[in-house]
Structure formats: structure tokens, C-alpha cells
């Protein structure tokens, strides 16, 4: 596979329809890809942003390494909320991409920043047999419902990148996430970034490279299994 040194392809805006509800997402497919299946990275944006804001910083790396990037919009851009934004929404999004492009279904990954980071960790645990691995920046596991999440069917690989000067997500919160995951048999990788704050975009190329290095070797041992959850109907 010939991989371009820099991205020339454009990010496109796509739509996935779920129960007549049209949800936008942004897609980057490197020009250099051939017909062989490639990994898929789902990126979850921070509060107040959109999917394109997180797809764009991944374009060059995706072109060099040869993978596809998809970034959905949260239903409410201020926060990612289950069940509106997943797991079902992410499943249908992935299946929509797979219907158009050759995806290595055993190498589908999650990356999230800030609000998308906490949600990314949650989705990774809920769908540990569907996604191969997850990496997040500036986020941690929510304490609410955490014990149930830790009963994940698979010890999915996870990496957490956190700035030592992050004013929004304390370093201790990331360390606590690492510790509770480790206590339950996971092997999380915590990267404490010295003199770094909450600003992902300031150091995006370096963060993305480290995140991808932590993700790319992870592979499901068998075809992905999507787990269906039941949620109480909202009034």
C-alpha cells in the first residue's frame, strides 16, 4: 500500500439515518488507500465543537499510516449522552462507513477529547468486543455507573493522555481511572504530559501519534460482537 506523506483528500460531511433521524458525521478517507481493508478510527469531539474539529487534526497521520477517520456530532454538542449518542448510534455509524469502504472490522478504534474522552472510555467498556481499543485525551471515567462498566466482557486496551496542568480534568481523576481499571484486571496506559493543560489542538500531532501508536497493534481475536442495551423510555 502506498501511503502519501501528507493529506490531500478532503473531509466530507456525511449523514447516517437511524429511525428517520438524520445524524451528521465527518469522514476522512486517504486518497492513497487501495481495496484492502484498513483500520477505522472513530473520534469524539469536545464540548461545543463538532466532528470535523477532531477529524481535521488526524488527516496527515491517517494518510501516512493508512486508516479512515470518522467524527460524529453529538446530539447536543455540549455533551455526549447515552443512549442518544451511543452505543447504538456509534454502531450504526460504523456500519454505514463499512457499507461504503473496506474496513478491517477487527481494528476499529475510539479516540476522544475532553467530553468525548469520558464518553469514549464508557463506550469502549460497553462495547469491548466491538471496538479493539481506545485512547483519550483530557478525560477520565465518570464515577457514576463505573462499577457496572468495569464488568466489561473483554479487557479492552485503553490509553489515557492527561496534562499535568489540566484545569478542567484533574490529574488525580485520570490516575483514579487508571487505578480502578487496573484493580479490575485491565492494563490501562496513563501518559502524564508535563506542563500540558487541556488544549489538545496545541499539541495534536504529537498526541495523535502517541495515541495511534497505542492503538494500532490492538486487534480483536475474532469478528466484532455488538452488545445491545435496553434503556428506559424517556418521558
Ranges and model annotations:
Residues 3-40, 85, 92, 115-123, ...:
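A domain-start/cap signature at the N-terminus of enzymes
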Residues 159-162, 166:
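Short beta-strand/loop motif that positions the catalytic acidic residue
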Residues 77, 193-200:
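Histidine-bearing beta->alpha loop at or near hydrolase active sites
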Residues 167-173:
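Conserved alpha/beta-hydrolase "acid-adjacent" motif
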Residues 31-36, 79-115, 130:
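Gly/Ser-rich "nucleophile elbow"/oxyanion-hole loop immediately N-terminal to the catalytic nucleophile
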Residues 33-79, 143, 167:
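Short substrate-entry loop that stabilizes the transition state in hydrolases
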Residues 54, 106-154:
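Primarily recognizes the serine-hydrolase "nucleophile elbow" in alpha/beta-hydrolase
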